[in-house]
Amino acid sequence: MSRKPLTVRVADVCFCHWPVDPDALERAIPSWLSVERAADDAWITAIHHTVSGVSAFGVDLGNPAQSVTVRTYVTGPDGQRGLYFFGAVTTDPIANAAGPLLRLNYRDGRVARREADGDHRTERTLDVDGRRALTIRYTPGDEPASTAPPDSLPAFFVERFRVFGDGPLGSKFVGNVGHDPWELGPVEATVEEDLLSVLSLPEPIGDSLVHYSPGNELGVSPFRPLWLD
C-alpha cells in the first residue's frame, strides 16, 4: 500500500482573508514569484485551525495541536499557481522542529482556542512578540458545508496544491499539498487583528472575509529545488 510521506489532518478550520495592495505585497515576497489577484486585489490569509493528527508514512506522530499559518497567493516563474507562507505559530513541538523541512518559518508565539462567551461559540487567539495579533470569534452555521464553485473567490483561496519557498543564497523550492476539495460552510464571525502589522506585512485595504471548514486531510510531499519540478 502506498503511503504519503506526511499526512496532516486538520479540523475546525477558520480562514481569515484580508485584501491588500498588490504592489505593496509584491515587495514582501521573493522576486521570482508574482502576486496573483482576485477581485482586483491581492490577498493575505491567516488560517486558524486544530491539527487533529499527523502521520509520516502511516506512523502517527504527536498530539492534537492548535496552529496558525499566514500565507498569500502567487504564481511561479512558469505561471504555476501556488502559495507562499509568511510564517506559522503552533503548540506542537514536532511541527516546530520540522519547520525548515517544510519551508515554514515557525515563530515564537501563543495560539489558543476556547469556548467563547457572548454571541459566538468559539474564540481563537494568536499572540506574537508579546502582542495580541489576532482574535477570531465565530459560530458555524447550521447548513451543511459544500465545495466551492470553480472559479469562485472561495475556490481561489482554498483549492491550491503547490507551495513555493525560498532558501539560503536565493535558492528556490517547490512542494505539493494534495487534498480533497475543501468543504466550506456558513459562519458568523468577528475579527480583531493587528497581525499584518506585527508581521511587517502590508496593511489591509478593506474588511476581512472569513470562511469556515469542518476539516480536511492534507498529503504533504517533501520540498524540492524548483529546477527539478
Question: Which role fits each region the language model picked out?
Answer:
Residues 1-10:
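A short, surface-exposed helix-loop junction/capping segment
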Residues 14, 69-229:
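Internal, well-folded beta-alpha domain core
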